[in-house]
């Protein structure tokens, strides 16, 4: 069983999303035997944003790239897709920045969203090719976006649900800590609530992974 763990917060010791992903991963290891993890810190070791030259490597080139830096970028793109496709569980730390996700996380998504690898176009419309995974997103936000007047400004969780759904990932679980910029008491209460929700999420993921393994054996 393979786990892909990504953090994207630009903060370190004070990062709420990093605290949550660490607890999620710890609980997953305790709940699932023989779980092998791959970790990427997308803020500490950022991935270059997509360019025309990098995107050209998503499909066969008339002739191989000769520039060493570009060759390395094409190889990285393949490595990122391979890591994602090989994973059974993906854990992503995704704080809300300016109503959306960190640019570091967007750079990773732009590398793995590749036609022919993680999705394809058919006569019946687009089809995701990365199904069967369990995705856990540790979401931290300064205000309240699940309800109320700020809900229409949520381009973070909505974006992640839509994007991974397009790639075929339907089992998306959120561990959510809101109100992190509303003062110490609301922030602490929201963090405690988020931490308390992790056990249920891990149990749900464990059941989902079991169903996925059973389907794979039948197929």
Residue ranges and their predicted role:
Residues 4, 38-40, 136-138, 173-175:
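Hydrophobic/aromatic beta-strand patches that form the interior of the parallel beta-sheet core
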Residues 8, 140, 177:
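Cofactor-binding loop segments of dinucleotide-utilizing enzymes, especially the Rossmann-like FAD-
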Residues 87-88, 132, 169:
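Short, well-ordered alpha-helix to beta-strand connector turns
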Residues 94-95, 139:
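Glycine-rich, N-terminal phosphate-binding loop of Rossmann-like dinucleotide-binding domains
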Residues 121-166:
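Short, glycine-/small-residue-rich phosphate/pyrophosphate-handling segment
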């Amino acid at each position: 069983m393979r786990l892909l763990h990504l953090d994207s917060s630009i903060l370190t010791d004070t990062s709420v999303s990093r605290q949550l992903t660490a607890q999620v991963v710890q609980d997953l290891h305790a709940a699932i035997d023989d779980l092998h993890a791959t970790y990427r810190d997308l803020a500490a070791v950022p991935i270059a944003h997509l360019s025309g030259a990098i995107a050209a490597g998503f499909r066969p080139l008339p002739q191989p790239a000769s520039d060493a830096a570009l060759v390395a970028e094409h190889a990285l793109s393949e490595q990122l897709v391979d890591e994602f496709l090989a994973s059974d569980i993906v854990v992503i730390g995704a704080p809300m920045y300016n109503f959306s996700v960190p640019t570091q996380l967007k750079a990773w998504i732009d590398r793995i969203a590749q036609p022919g690898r993680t999705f394809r176009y058919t006569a019946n419309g687009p089809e995701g090719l990365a199904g069967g995974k369990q995705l856990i997103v540790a979401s931290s936000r300064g205000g309240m976006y699940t309800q109320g007047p700020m809900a229409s400004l949520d381009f973070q969780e909505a974006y992640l649900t839509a994007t991974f759904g397009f790639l075929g990932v339907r089992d998306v679980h959120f561990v959510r800590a809101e109100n992190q910029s509303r003062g110490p008491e609301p922030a602490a209460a929201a963090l405690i609530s988020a931490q308390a929700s992790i056990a249920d999420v891990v149990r749900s993921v464990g059941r989902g992974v079991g169903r996925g393994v059973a389907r794979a054996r039948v197929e």
